[in-house]
Amino acid sequence: MAYTPANGELCKRWKKRAAHMKNERTSYETHWQELQDHFAPRSGRWIRGDRYSAGERGRKRNHKIINGTPLLSVNTLAAGMTSGNTSPARPWFRLTTPDPQLAEIGAVKQWLYAVEARMREVFSKSNLYRVLPTIYRDIGVYGTACMVELEDDDDVVRFEQFEIGSYWLAQSNRKRIDTLYREFQLTVRQIVQEFGVDACSERVKNMAKNGQWETWIDVCHAIAPNDERYIDGERWDMPVRSMYWEASGNEDKMLAVRGFESSPLLGCRWTTSGEEVYGSSPCMDALGDAKALQLKELRKAEAIDKVVNPPLIAPTSLRNQRVSMLPGDITYVDSQQSQAGLKPIHDWRPDLNAIGEDIMRSEELIRRALYVDLFLMMQNDTRSNITAREIQERHEEKLLMLGPVVERVNDELLDPIIDRTFDILVRKSRPYWEGLLNGEPLIPPPPEELAEVDLKVEFISVLAQAQKAVGLSAMDNLFGFAASLAQMNPGVLDKLDFDQAIDERADMLGVSPRIVVPDDKVAEMREAKAQQAQQAQAMQQGMAMAEMVGKAGGVKVDQTTALGRALDVAGAGPVGV
């Protein structure tokens, strides 16, 4: 049977499944809250417990932060990953085909470029670039981040990011996150607007009836593959199911059961071990240093306080007397007791320089763990004689350190974003292609060459290209070696395919396909040039023949002969008497 919002069986099953998912995450929560306290105090939503509930969302949270290096390092990591991997200022992905020869066809190349341009426009218009920094922050701090990509009538797509602590995840047999359960809060008014008053529990109905519109209600939401899918045209029988219900309601009743043609769930981890659902992060590695840093900073402040405002000793005669420590003030004592004034209890002079150096070492360890030295490499290098080549090599070498996480982010986050966005664009454009609707489609119809062809995504961001820099260096070395050999034997250049070298280098550099001429057009251009060269050669030969004939005297030339045709091409006309 197909589950409907009315039968309640689906709600019971998901309440039971949610309990198992909560049990899986329990062991991570204490660790996450420590990471939150030391690296990202304003992140996290622990709304169902006593920690940062709805009434305390605006209160101060950075009470454990004395030295801000961990927070600044997290901000640098998030900004560096955003600008290095998904910068809105430059293309960071490219669509191509599995067959390189197919991608070189002019019509295919132009269509792929048009779709890329449309997708970049959609991403810029949506809130993607406002959400991604938070995603990078979460995987850097907690090792796990999650959001959904939803269709939008105004912006084509929009993204909603979920804070750590508010959701629970499960993964498929392929170790990919495909199930989300989360808890959040809506006011009574928002619930009625979103789901309708008839779908609400009796408790919410009574609140709405009594005008308690701004009362907060805990709501549960789940997104998962539809394992009981039956194709009968109903929304809850789509490949992916989305379900809402009230967390505190005693009724086994869904607020709504909706569906998606493709999964909107986007779960990403920094790195994982074995069958773990939740990931590990660089902040987990730096947590000990962050705790030590705050303790050292506290002890340094205490030491400075003891030097500037030390504990004092005083004679007993001053016990009940007025004593002032204010600048310029006077404390009266007898002349016989003038040597028995206030004095520090001990002459202690802490080595503040050594303490400061130790703090700097802890700060440096945190920055290195969070790749701050990588993202701020040029800022930290104060040498004036560094060469451009050295800058490039050092930049590429350091960026290689992010290779594993870049590959994982591309695989778990960016690739699904591009796939789902492309599916949405195709679905919205198809009625215009088929003439069912009038107007311009979001993307043009694909050329015939791409029928039944699955497209491939290539990432060309700064971080992705750093992984390909080894190929560029190898190509440069090969051509440099061939050039040196060609001075002794020019025939060695026949071993190199210069056209293919241009194409591959352009791909590695992420050059726009409009700059590189497709192979079929290059062949046409070369054929036209060859024909022009043949015609020019024939004209030269004809003119030379005409000159020879003129010198020889009146010789009649048959126009059907090769000489006659050459003279005709050259414009010499018939020659003879």
Task: Please provide the spans of the model-predicted regions.
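Structured, contiguous alpha/beta core segments that scaffold functional sites
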Residues: 4-7, 11-13, 19, 150-327
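Long, contiguous amphipathic alpha-helices that act as assembly "spine/axial" helices in icosahedral shell
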Residues: 74, 104-151, 278-312, 347-379, ...
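Extended, helix-rich architectural segments
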Residues: 1-214
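C-terminal anchoring/interaction modules
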Residues: 1-30, 37-39, 44, 309-577
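Generic hydrophobic, helix-prone segments enriched in Leu/Val/Ile
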Residues: 32, 77-82, 131-139, 219, ...
